[in-house]
């Protein structure tokens, strides 16, 4: 093992529990892919890392859906759990245990924690008034009440907020309220509820939220909530309800959000019982193990306020860290069924390779909570350029010569210094993975891939192969290149597990991060088979078509404005005028904001024989981190221009009307910095 991984760590990792009431979609998958990559990395480094999850299987919504389908809630959640597991497996998400909150273990821990809170005098009871459906004989949550918005008078709005004007209100303020379950007019009715005395944990939470367990942005947000004052948390619901009944409280059930995070304990306990793992070692108060929760930023309050308080009061350890991520947009907009961008996991798998999405998400993920845009044009371009055009290309250009000319046997490594750079880069890449800065890791890996491709381009094995007496040189070139490829695939293995497995088989060698310095020499390999195909935009279009739901035109609504006319073609020029323009392929080495500039980004461009500094008016459409490592096209012989912010030494090519609709041009895969655009 390397120095960085000598100390074996015991790590438990969870993702938020998907609700057992519907399918997995691409917005969900960001989190599970992010978590799976991190867990696979930890295991590659030799750590003892477990990944558990479960379906969140309780609540009114599940009870009502099962009723509509004429089945029991148990039958519904069993079916949905099977569907979820199949979807996750399709994306190579590898859980050590995938369980359900509707389990004996979860009931035990829910009751145990509740009794501890009660014994510590942190449970209160009091009567509250709620809307009640007289036909279904059930209390109604805000989302099960509809009526007319009291502010804008839009009909058919939910009981807590208006989707038309954004107003928030109480169900009692709705005009003409009705039950969304039966259609009956609800009545107000009193009921005794159980509350967790969260305000009594203010001092504990003030310290814990600043202990390093949260990202700075999250800790700052929670500080605002703590300053505003915490409220007691209603942890009970009235029958009928699908869930666990509260001990000694007939007809009262634990609210789904009480037993959902407890599902982490239950799923891990189930794994421990099956595999003989010491549960207490991970969850006792003074545990030396590490526990990490990956979640979406919309459920921070449950995981960073309620959950640590419950654990602390019940005698368990608190999480080492809770890491939140942002939401997914598609093509710059909220996922939409009418546009076909509300894409289900199964629909994606029917059309595209899951490792495309794993790589694209990894290439854009940071350790922060910013939202992520899945731009489908960029998705295709990046996968084709990075994975097919760079990484796989190295093996496909080298392996054939080894198989045909040298009976599948590698020779001696002759580029030790170059390979040392690849080996040494593993520690920096490991640091990026550890910090969940996957985008930075991918950019560093692609920098190495560029070096490997440039090496093959410079050495030209296809030319050497035709020369007499150059067999040793040809074998050495291909041996060097395939060792570079092996190191790249080692670093990409957490992101591309299936491709990594195929690479291991082809190379007859395990991809071992900690022993990566052991190079392949005089070693037999198998015949190379294509590892990955290019993304075809036609496949993406078919996926979007399959995801679309026809939306009827709203009565009385004006039709959308017609698309603006395209800008007319400019007047003709003579060819000699055009020939004066020197267009070159350029790699964006660095991209950064320009202080004081609203529209500009500063780009450092590698054009093969030096770097150029260019100011580009593309800030409205691109984040700097999304540009670094990409290939583009620039006007290389444009006279440098002095600007307020510095000297601009060229111009990158982009299309679009402006604003968010600016699209920088990218060359096809295989193009390298400095190539002239013909």
Swiss-Prot record:
Subunit structure: Homodimer.
Keywords assigned: Aminoacyl-tRNA synthetase, ATP-binding, Cytoplasm, Ligase, Metal-binding, Nucleotide-binding, Protein biosynthesis, RNA-binding, tRNA-binding, Zinc
Domain tRNA-binding stretches: 577-678
Binding site for ATP: 337
Compartment(s) where it occurs, according to its Swiss-Prot or TrEMBL record: Cytoplasm
Family indicated by similarity: Belongs to the class-I aminoacyl-tRNA synthetase family. MetG type 1 subfamily.
Annotated EC: 6.1.1.10
InterPro entries with a match to the protein in the record: aa-tRNA-synth_I_CS, Anticodon_Met, Met-tRNA-synth_bsu_C, Met-tRNA_ligase_1, Met-tRNA_synth, Methionyl/Leucyl_tRNA_Synth, MetRS_core, MetRS_Zn
RNA-binding recorded as keyword: yes
GO cellular component terms, semicolon-separated: cytosol
UniProt cofactor(s): Zn(2+)
Top enzyme class: ligase
PANTHER family per the UniProt record, alphabetical: METHIONINE--TRNA LIGASE (PTHR45765), METHIONINE--TRNA LIGASE, CYTOPLASMIC (PTHR45765:SF1)
Function: Is required not only for elongation of protein synthesis but also for the initiation of all mRNA translation through initiator tRNA(fMet) aminoacylation.
Protein name: Methionine--tRNA ligase
Motif 'KMSKS' region per UniProt: ranges: 334-338
Main subcellular localisation: cytoplasm
Taxon lineage: Bacteria, Pseudomonadati, Pseudomonadota, Gammaproteobacteria, Pseudomonadales
């Amino acid at each position: 093992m390397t120095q960085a991984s000598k100390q074996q760590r015991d790590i438990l990792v969870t993702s938020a529990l998907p609700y057992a009431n519907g399918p997995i979609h691409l917005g969900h998958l960001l989190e599970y892919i992010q978590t799976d990559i991190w867990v696979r990395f930890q295991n590659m480094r030799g750590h003892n890392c477990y990944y558990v999850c479960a379906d969140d299987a309780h609540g009114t919504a599940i009870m009502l859906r099962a009723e509509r389908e004429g089945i029991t809630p148990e039958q519904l959640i069993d079916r949905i759990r099977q569907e979820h597991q199949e979807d996750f497996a399709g994306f190579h998400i590898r859980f050590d245990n995938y369980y359900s909150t509707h389990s004996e273990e979860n009931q035990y821990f829910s009751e145990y924690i509740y009794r501890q809170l009660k014994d510590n005098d942190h449970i209160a009871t009091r009567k509250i008034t709620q809307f009640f459906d007289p036909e279904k004989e059930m209390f109604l949550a805000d989302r099960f009440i509809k009526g007319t918005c009291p502010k804008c008078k839009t009909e058919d709005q939910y009981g807590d907020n208006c989707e038309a004007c954004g107003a928030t209100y109480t169900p009692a303020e709705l005009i003409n309220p009705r039950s969304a379950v039966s259609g009956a007019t609800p009545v107000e009715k009193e009921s005794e509820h159980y509350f967790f005395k969260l305000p009594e944990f203010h001092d504990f939470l003030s310290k814990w939220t600043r202990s390093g367990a949260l990202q700075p942005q999250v800790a700052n947000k929670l500080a605002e909530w703590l300053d505003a004052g915490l409220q007691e948390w209603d942890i009970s619901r009235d029958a009928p309800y699908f869930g666990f009944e509260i001990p000694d409280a007939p007809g009262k059930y634990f609210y789904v959000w009480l037993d959902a995070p407890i599902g982490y304990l239950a799923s891990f306990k189930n794994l421990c019982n099956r595999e003989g793992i010491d549960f207490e070692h991970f969850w006792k108060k003074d545990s030396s193990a590490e526990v990490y929760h990956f979640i979406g930023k919309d459920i921070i309050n449950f995981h960073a306020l309620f959950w640590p308080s419950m654990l602390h009061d019940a005698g368990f350890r608190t999480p080492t860290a809770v890491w939140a991520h942002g939401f997914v947009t598609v093509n710059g907009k909220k996922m939409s069924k009418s546009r076909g961008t509300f894409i289900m996991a199964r629909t994606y798998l029917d059309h595209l390779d899951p490792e495309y999405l794993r790589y694209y998400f990894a290439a854009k993920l940071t350790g922060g909570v910013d939202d992520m845009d899945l731009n489908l044009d960029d998705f295709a371009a990046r996968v084709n350029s990075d994975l097919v055009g760079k990484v796989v290309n190295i093996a496909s250009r080298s392996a054939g010569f080894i198989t045909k000319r040298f009976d599948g046997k590698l020779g001696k490594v002759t580029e030790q210094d170059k390979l040392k750079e690849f080996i040494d880069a593993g520690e920096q890449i490991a640091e990026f993975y550890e910090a969940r800065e996957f985008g930075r890791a991918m950019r560093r890996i692609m920098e190495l891939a560029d070096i490997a491709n440039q090496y093959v381009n410079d050495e030209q094995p296809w030319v050497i192969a035709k020369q007499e007496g150059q067999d040793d040189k040809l074998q050495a070139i291909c041996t060097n290149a395939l060792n570079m490829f092996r190191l790249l695939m080692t670093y990409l293995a957490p992101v591309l597990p299936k491709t990594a497995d195929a690479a291991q088989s082809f190379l007859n060698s395990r991809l071992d991060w900690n022993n990566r310095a052991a190079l392949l020499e005089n070693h037999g390999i198998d015949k190379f088979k294509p590892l990955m195909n290019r993304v075809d935009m036609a496949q993406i279009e078919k996926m979007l078509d399959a995801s679309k739901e026809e939306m009827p035109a709203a009565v009385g609504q004006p039709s959308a404005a017609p698309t603006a006319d395209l800008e007319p073609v400019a007047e003709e020029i003579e060819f000699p005028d055009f020939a004066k323009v020197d267009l070159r392929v350029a790699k964006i080495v660095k991209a950064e904001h320009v202080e004081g500039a609203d529209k500009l980004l500063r780009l450092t461009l590698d054009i093969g024989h030096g770097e150029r500094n260019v100011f580009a008016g593309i800030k409205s459409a691109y984040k700097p981190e999304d540009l670094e490592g990409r290939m583009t096209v620039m006007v290389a012989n444009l006279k440098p221009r002095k600007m307020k912010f510095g000297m601009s030494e060229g111009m990158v090519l982009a299309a679009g009307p402006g604003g968010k609709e600016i699209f920088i041009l990218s060359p096809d895969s295989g193009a390298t910095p400095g190539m002239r655009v013909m």
